[in-house]
Amino acid sequence: MLRKYQSLIPIYTLLLLVACATAPESDVDTPEYHFKAGMRAIDNADYQQAIKSFQRSVDLDKKFALGYGGLGLAHAYLGQNGQAKDYASKCASRGSKDSEALALSGQIWITMRDSEKKWFKRASSHLKKALKRDEAHEGAMYWYGVAHLYNYQFDEAEDYFRKVVNKRGDYAGKADAKWKLAQKIVRAMPGTPAGKKMALKEKINRADLAVLFAEELKIGVLFDRMPVQNTDFQTPGQATQTANVTVPNDAINHWAETWIKDMIRYGIMDVEPDGNFYPDDTINRALYAMAVQRLLV
């Protein structure tokens, strides 16, 4: 009697799985379409909408690896690393034979690079597996190039971007832009880790600029080497250097306070009329040009 019912267990299991999945409401209510919608939301930085789209994709198909990867990517952008890592693992396990899913898992780890020490190792593991499955996979090559770029391995990054550009596929435009960025950084050759990190930022603020001037251009060393005038007369710049510097209120205990104080002391960057420095304000071209001009005078 028991054997008779044992043969029905797989059927009941299948029926249970089907019952747990959400039924589509239209022929175009598919996991693939919801995934594409989620990725467009990611591009628009609408991460909550992205989560809704990705969640719908896995509700429709519990085995849809890319949906879990999309959820991981959205949570990574939101700084919710625990959830992001869980979904990255689900994506890689459910899509272990799918280069696109493995590449997406790698992308999740790249997105968490500022807060996860082992991001490059984890991303590389997924991307290597993706390329092992398909050595010509465009997305995996592109993201491996991005991983090398953010790991300051510029030659390796350029190699991957070159291959992607030559394929002239969907990633060619993005790869070309990243390739040019890598070339610019190599030509500029930032000499410090801070310089390399700033070179990869799309925007920098006033605090970042203070650090760059101090560490990359060695402003303090340059001013210390300037000949001392044997006269009672001092230029405004020399007077600024010898005077005690009052740290603006909004720079006190700021992570860049030391560098901000130096730039004020040497007259390279100004305190605003209201007494604040505004260290977190984004630098525009005019402010940057003004600071550079003061260095040259």
Where do the protein language model's features map onto the residues?
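Bacterial N-terminal signal peptides that target proteins for export
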Residues: 2-10
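Alpha-helical segment of the N-proximal tetratricopeptide repeat
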Residues: 26-63, 77, 114-115
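Conserved structural position within tetratricopeptide repeats
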Residues: 56-59, 90-93, 125-132, 166
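N-terminal propeptides
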Residues: 23-27, 81-83, 96, 100, ...
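C-terminal motif of bacterial Sec signal peptides marking the signal peptidase cleavage site
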Residues: 18-19
